[in-house]
Swiss-Prot record:
This is Probable endopolygalacturonase D. Gene3D superfamilies: Single-stranded right-handed beta-helix, Pectin lyase-like. Pfam families: Glyco_hydro_28 (PF00295). SUPFAM superfamilies: Pectin lyase-like. The keyword RNA-binding does not apply. It catalyses: (1,4-alpha-D-galacturonosyl)n+m + H2O = (1,4-alpha-D-galacturonosyl)n + (1,4-alpha-D-galacturonosyl)m. Glycans are attached at N292, N407, N441. GO terms for molecular function: polygalacturonase activity. Belongs to the glycosyl hydrolase 28 family. PbH1 repeats lie at residues 216-238, 258-280, 281-319, 320-341, 371-392, 400-422, 434-478. Disulfide bonds join C151-C166, C336-C352, C461-C466, C484-C491.
Amino acid sequence: MKRSALILSFLPLVFGCDNPKSPGHSCASVYSVSSAAASSFCATFTASTVTATTGVPEALLSNCDYKTKHLSSACSCLGTAAVPTVATPSSVSSVYITSATATPTSFTFKTSTAHIVKVAKAATSSTAVVTTPVSVPTASSSFTGNGGTTCTVTEYAAISSAVASCSNILLSDIYAPPSSTIDLQGLQTGAAVIFAGKTTFGDTADSDFDPIVVSGTSVTITGVEGHVIDGNGAAYWDGQGSNGGSDKPDHFFVVKDMYNSRIENLYIQNWPVHCFEIESTEHLTVSGLTLNNSAGDAANSKSDGDPAAHNSDGFDIKESSYFTLENTWVHNQDDCVAVTSGTDIVVDGMYCYGGHGLSIGSIGGKSDNTVNGVTFSNSQVISSQNGCRIKTNSGETGEVYNIRYENITLSDISDYGIDVQQDYLNGGPTGEPTNGVTIANVTFVDVTGTMSDGKDYYILCGDDSCSNFVFDGVSITGGSGDSCNYPSTGCP
């Protein structure tokens, strides 16, 4: 037996009436939001006795187009409690919420009791409709925006239809089967996607498989309190990441062709290799995320004593402009943030633990090899291999300029506090820098902290390929054997 559910997110119920224009029209909306005032008004108002708008409350009047017909129709909606016959949808997996609230720009969720209308098609093809109360996430008064339909999806199969037809999408306890991407590429302009419960994935041994993909314009991606997105990393971790071993999804959460949008307040754990790939975005802000890959620190039967997770970058950013990453916590085993191309990028308020620090690069050998205007600021790098790093690939070309590290605190760094090297290869540095990638206008301000081992400073530039480095208030201690072939004055 197939069944679906239609959740009406406002009370009292508005059923079986001539709702002005559409279910999301502001006239019906203001009646439902201000039900007490509307009920008092409707008790004395009918279209047959009132033909003018004199004395009508302004809030009702303005939202009903100053028309008595709409006022009367909305009053009828408010007082009607009859439940209509509802055709059985073909999908069994979605819960649709009809709401006059709009696409949110900020989210505060609460749990309230709404009415759920369950539709079940019996063997005789007759349609049975029952109404029962159920707790569902609904928006508080701060849930504001441009209106539209909100859909709650509880099964993977319903995601595509929700993306195509809904302004606001709540993904609740989604399980994505093997080889099944949570595909959010067709979102409506201004849409919001909210993760709730635990999102999980089946095993997909394929390096080209992307578990989550999102794109869109003026889109918001967020999560309710207590949600978890679990990447099933333990099924893949073998200590080799993308460098070898078994096939595994290379990028867990792909964000591409996304404009004037926000990703905020997500909790992600146990991703297989790289977590976020940010590609070809403009005016995107990522804020308040927690990326927790701490389970990958431990060795397993495949990793030969090394951490099981490898190449587990938090954020790989490329070909993007006016991008902001802020107030985010990352525990991983590779770059906390790596910018490989792009312009006007701000990374602020980061807490990076266990990985390879705040990085530019590696640069060279890609379709876009220019980085211009990147600021890392007000961040901590803890128990990591590197603090602040710029790495360019040996024998390649490109340009890196206008880079700023400011107010960065380092603690328990094992390899390099500040590292600029032009001999990088994924398999290990060559020790022989090349000058095909130029690095210019790099400023380190108030970069301070301690090493557990390694070098406080390591700068290895090619011939005449580095210029205009500034060190101001830089103090890193605890390491030894510092080496800087640029500037001519040596290490800070």
